[in-house]
Amino acid sequence: MLPNEAMYPYTAKEARDRGELELWRANFRTNCACAGAIELAIHRDFDGMHLKDGCAKSVIDQYGYRRVGYVLANTLQLHAYDGRYHETNKRWSRTIFVPEDGGHRHTFLIGSHPAVLDGFVSDYRAELEQLQANSNQAMCMGEMTM
């Protein structure tokens, strides 16, 4: 498994050409594990009607914002036809580049019900917005002390 925010940026073919197939494999396995962790978190925090607030946080803590976003975006991009995902979440997913990779993308699709997964995506995005707001506030505070 790769560390939290370390992501291998190339496809399997590019990795093979670069002699970095083991790095690609580690990244791929981590993407698959992240998708599984998302499914487990949803299973744990969905009561049949509502997804518990903060459900995404445990997965973010384990895999990092970047990888969780990448895995979520992959699923939404591959299921763009599904009307159960909110349009704002689908639009957000298109801002993340997930390269075609010879069918490997389909291996780390998240299998949770789309309406519930949509709630998880919204929760993830709220966590990300909070992180960005805190970062901006910290930068402003740093500028004020200079």
Please state what every model-predicted region is.
Residues 1-145:
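Gram-negative host-targeted secretion-system effectors, predominantly Type III and Type IV
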